[in-house]
Amino acid sequence: MAIKAEEISALLKSQIENYESGMTVTDVGTVIQVGDGIALVHGLNNVMAGELVEFHNGVLGLAQNLEENNVGVVILGPFTDIKEGDEVKRTGRIMEVPVGEELIGRVVNPLGQPIDGRGPLNTTKTRPIESPATGVMDRKSVDEPLQTGIKAIDALVPIGRGQRELIIGDRQTGKTTVAIDTILNQKDEDMICVYVAIGQKESTVRTAVETLRAHGALDYTIVVSASASQPAPLLYIAPYAGVAMAEEFMFNGKHVLIVYDDLTKQAAAYRELSLLLRRPPGREAYPGDVFYLHSRLLERAAKLNDSLGGGSITALPFVETQAGDISAYVPTNVISITDGQIFLQSDLFFSGVRPAINAGLSVSRVGGSAQIKAMKKVAGTLRLDLASYRELESFAQFGSDLDPATKAKLERGKRTVEVLKQDQNKPLTVDKQVTILYALTKGHLDDIPVQDITRFEDEFLGWVGSNAPHIYQEIRETKGLPADEVFVEAINAFKKIFNKSEV
């Protein structure tokens, strides 16, 4: 069939009439200098502070320094392919990460990209990594306990939902173990956990993930990992990415626990970026806004009031000290921002007291309102007992002739230290903690040899579970203590069958 010339011309005419010239205007700049994860870009006249920009190879950057003639950009990815003269485009977006239920059980990097080899994330929801903290009137005071499963913490420095509790100590004193145990203990507590690993070895993160998986804790945990091999900008944004993921759950009325492991490495990464961007250094070469770096992050942890759904974010930031010096710059900053600190001491750790919590320097500024009634009653005198024991212990080294009252205090102190010891990855439920602490504080362990205390505890708690489960049930349901007679009867019945070791 021949096509007529008129038809062709009519077709061309209609195509020409319908043609729309689509023109897009993009603000572009040129890289004038690049190195160490920082690019200096000329142009980008209308760029916003904190805006994402895109390099020619698809790598994103974050506009940080807005100067008269150029923009300092931190590069969020590999920077070896970026060279002088490359084009940089504005995106008009600020930094956002994917959020939602789909992230639970996954390991992601600070950009929200999965790194666990289990395929893409099926979520379309995102949140900006920087957002203002909730206001004063949107909050509510902390009144619900967050059970860590660690006796020394739940009894001496209780943590509440919505609190910020700093965990501080030298390297290799068991800080990460405290966090992992706390996450494991949230199994049936309807909590979502976010573990942010900043500047950790890949192998360490792998071990933590495998521990969580083995105990079934990955079913309610998101792991955000910015390992030591990542460029500094990713270490800097990792905590903000983690808290953005947590906020999505908090504003939907859920309770979240977020662990930052650790903020010292984030501060060091931020110092590196600031020095490369030629910002003036201050104390310990940190930039002037290193306090704001952490305060704006930790203020996003809150307990919301009921009109906003009553959700909460509880933050456990970690800070690593050098030789136990808690008066350095970053430790003092974070201590002043948080609602208390748990100080892990290397001397205690090496002497076999684990978790190595120094009860004298550790404090919770929320205190009793984050404990159930039963725990408040049994743990009331525990801190004082421990403090007086530590004081007497140093005196007792010099003199052997001690009066009976002092001897009794020392003996009780030794048993207190033994009871507060705990193996890793074995968190205890609050009913079991209350039961053993009752036996300790009421003097029922005074006739048990010190070397038998740990065995007595394990066997006694197992015996109560089998022969007197009503004790655990009453503590769980009423949050109060059962009658003294019930406890005493159970303790005495077990003591009759307990085999003390020969002294």
UniProtKB/Swiss-Prot annotation:
InterPro entries registered for this protein in UniProt: ATP_synth_asu-like_sf (IPR023366), ATP_synth_asu_C (IPR000793), ATP_synth_asu_C_sf (IPR038376), ATP_synth_F1_a_nt-bd_dom (IPR033732), ATP_synth_F1_asu (IPR005294), ATPase_a/bsu_AS (IPR020003), ATPase_F1/V1/A1_a/bsu_N (IPR004100), ATPase_F1/V1/A1_a/bsu_N_sf (IPR036121)
Catalysed transformations (reactions): ATP + H2O + 4 H(+)(in) = ADP + phosphate + 5 H(+)(out)
Keywords, in A-Z order: ATP synthesis, ATP-binding, Cell membrane, CF(1), Hydrogen ion transport, Ion transport, Membrane, Nucleotide-binding, Translocase, Transport
Location relative to the cell: Cell membrane
UniProt site (Required for activity): S362
Record lineage: Bacteria, Bacillati, Bacillota, Bacilli, Bacillales
Known function: Produces ATP from ADP in the presence of a proton gradient across the membrane. The alpha chain is a regulatory subunit.
CC per GO annotation: plasma membrane; proton-transporting ATP synthase complex
Stored PROSITE patterns: ATPASE_ALPHA_BETA (PS00152)
Bilayer topology: Peripheral membrane protein
Residues binding ATP: G169, D170, R171, Q172, T173, G174, K175, T176
Broad EC category: translocase
GO molecular function annotations of the record: ADP binding; ATP binding; proton-transporting ATP synthase activity, rotational mechanism
The species this protein was found in: Macrococcus caseolyticus (strain JCSC5402)
EC number: 7.1.2.2
Protein's recorded name: ATP synthase subunit alpha
Family named by the database record: Belongs to the ATPase alpha/beta chains family.
Source taxon at top rank: Bacteria
Primary localization class, coarse: membrane
Assembly and binders: F-type ATPases have 2 components, CF(1) - the catalytic core - and CF(0) - the membrane proton channel. CF(1) has five subunits: alpha(3), beta(3), gamma(1), delta(1), epsilon(1). CF(0) has three main subunits: a(1), b(2) and c(9-12). The alpha and beta chains form an alternating ring which encloses part of the gamma chain. CF(1) is attached to CF(0) by a central stalk formed by the gamma and epsilon chains, while a peripheral stalk is formed by the delta and b chains.
